[in-house]
Amino acid sequence: MGPIMSTGETSTAHTVLGCQITDKTVITLFVILVFSCLVAVVGNGFIIIALGMKWLLRRTLSAHNKLLISLAASRFCLQCVVIGKNIYVFLNPSSFPYNPVIQLLNLMWDFLTAATIWFCSLLGFFYCVKIATLTHPVFVWLKYRLPGWVPWMLLSAVGMSSLTSILCFIGNHMIYQNYARRGHQPWNATGNSLRHSLEKFYFISIKIIMWTVPTVIFSIFMSLLLVSLVRHMKKTLLALSELRDVWAQAHFKALLPLLSFIILFISCFLTLVLSSASSTPYQEFRYWMWQVVIHLCTVIHPIVILLSNPVLRVVMKRGCC
């Protein structure tokens, strides 16, 4: 995942490239991780192709679908980076976690992770404004203004994600430069002091701040949306008592994708924070466990989108026939 990994101590979870790999648990987790990422790549790739074809045919795309295709594209690229990085660290478990190869992979990972979180947040904000049955003048005004803001919102998200990745890259590069100056000795006390300080304060602060802001925005607006939908559902069921079962099922189907979106997003955010806060060497079981948990969360949501979005569902049925 992020750059805060430690290899000061040599673990024997699995051996270095060229030697026999003995830890079956690590191998199993690695296979599960790669398979999960491949499923996510296929799911997000299908969303990109379906919406991209619609964009080409109609020469336009709704604001909602622009957000959706941006989220799918960021997740697609993120899963490809995750596969590449984890294949590299699986084959080179004792490599220095700030070497040039991992620096480049971390730069892409930091950018795409931040972009994915921001796009999810913007999608949640969009859902709230367009779907919520709130009558406050601000919400009524936003309903008409929001579609025109979507391109600028996406550009702002890309800008914030770029800032996150650049700040993290600066810290990564400082650690590697210090490591190179001291003769590539990861156990050097002075070098480790700088490294541990940056890992403990600099990286954690940047990531938690940059990830928490969009998560708070997402949580606030999705909470407003759920409250609005529950109130609307209660009023509808009371007014139409003879159709109560039919309406209850319809509302439940509408709420289910939103609830899954919220649960998966919050789960992924918490897992990212917890994994970033722990300095886990690449060789250890915990590193691979965190990876599997994080990316299982990101695998499920594209499937939910495919099953709940009418346009994508029709395209998927045509493709299967």
Curated annotation (Swiss-Prot):
Cytoplasmic topological domain: 50-75, 128-149, 229-253, 308-321
Lipid bilayer topology: Multi-pass membrane protein
Gene name of the record: Tas2r135
Cellular component, GO annotation: membrane
Signal peptide start and end residues: none
Role: Putative taste receptor which may play a role in the perception of bitterness.
A GO term, aspect molecular function: G protein-coupled receptor activity
Protein name: Taste receptor type 2 member 135
Lineage start: Eukaryota, Metazoa, Chordata, Craniata, Vertebrata
Transmembrane segments: 29-49, 76-96, 107-127, 150-170, 208-228, 254-274, 287-307
Glycosylated sites: N188
Family indicated by similarity: Belongs to the G-protein coupled receptor T2R family.
Keyword Glycoprotein recorded: yes
Localization of this protein: Membrane
Note: Several bitter taste receptors are expressed in a single taste receptor cell.
